[in-house]
Amino acid sequence: KMIADATDLPMIVFQYSNEVAYPLDTLVQICEDVPNVKAIKDWSPPQVHERHIKTLHALSRPINVLSTNSAWLMSSLVMGADGLLSGAGSVIADLQSELYQAVQAKDLPKAQELADRIYHTTQVFYCDPFGDMHNRMKEALVLLGRQDGPAVVRPPLMKLTQVEIARIAEAMTAAGIAKEGAIGLDSPALAAE
């Protein structure tokens, strides 16, 4: 509330897994009492995520639910998530955007094809140790030539091994990701970039 009182900027509440997330009653109260809150970034497990979508959409001032569940993004969008905020978007935003559009158009075959491509990336980005996820995305950006190398790793994390970097390269190939973006997308807006 103190932050909202200091600005009229829109705000997003981050629901970071069950252990540290706001209980649903508290989340609803925040959304009702703080008009700046326009959305939540939701990293909750499926059952809780769906409850958030249904509850927050039913408020007198509906709140957008933005998924950060990259590993099961298609399911999240089908549940009714309004969009996404994902670290993986630094590498695969075009695939994520196309998946969102396919789900909105109820084009299940296309959505499944895109989710299959995304799967290759999430398997290498979000594997153990989980804390290295952003370092893996940085390495992907370097491998794709989108960012100058070497990828910067902040302590206490350590640089990824060459074996892991090779797995990331294989995943980018399997997902059809190139320097310019995902290969073979139909979206005119993305093709023009």
Question: Residue ranges of each PLM-predicted region?
Answer:
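Proteins with a high burden of low-complexity, intrinsically disordered sequence enriched in S/T/G/P/A and R
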Residues: 1, 49-50, 137, 187
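Active-site beta->alpha loop and helix N-cap motifs at the rims of alpha/beta catalytic domains
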Residues: 1-21, 158, 178, 182, ...
